Amino acid sequence: MTEYGRRGVVGMGLAGGAALALGGCAPAQDGRSWPGATPTSDGRFAGFTEYVPVTLEIRTDLGRLDRRMPGVTISSAHWVMQYQQEQREVLPPQDRPIWIHGVMTLDPASTRALAEASSGKADPLPGIYPGLRQYVPEGKVFTTVPKEKADAILDIEHMMQDDPSRFESSSFDTEQVAVCADANLLIFIARERHT
């Protein structure tokens, strides 16, 4: 290879490296959330930290939540779920946990049990998926329920499988729970793992 050819190859390599480095400064594509980014200015909530490559559909069905939390009576719910992933994920979905965020209305007895187990004001509120924040009324006071107490009241130990005929089992663990006794509302962040 001639001297000129080597310089050309090195020059192209440097130019390509610079382009890649500067490409990281480009704005994110629409419909994507990056770790730490909170696309809403609602200061009541902690930052949303999950990577979401596409906008999630907000679900309102209760079946999956009722099966995961048999210790409470859910009247209505708005929730989302997605396999946990990084921007460049290498693990197949079935090998990753599922994160679930939700805002639920509970019956008064369920709310009372959670409120009695709470440990103080939730400030900030759990960093739920930004599309769910519209279902949390402003001006309401939420209290934090410690994980162990929330898990016991929600009775996650007795959760039911979606498909009992499958050999694999799931575990459901709450990570953050906040309750508003006045509005019978529960905000939660949970993870589900398949074994």
Protein language model features and the residues they cover:
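Mature extracytoplasmic domains of secretory-pathway proteins
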Residues: 71-152
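N-terminal export signals
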Residues: 2-3, 8-27
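Extracellularly exposed regions in secreted/surface proteins, prominently low-complexity, repeat-rich
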Residues: 159-195
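Intrinsically disordered, low-complexity boundary segments flanking structured domains
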Residues: 61-69, 88-91, 174
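Short, surface-exposed loop and linker segments with low hydrophobicity and enrichment for Pro/Ser/Thr
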Residues: 1, 7, 90-98, 171-185
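Bacterial lipoprotein signal-peptidase II cleavage site
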Residues: 25-35
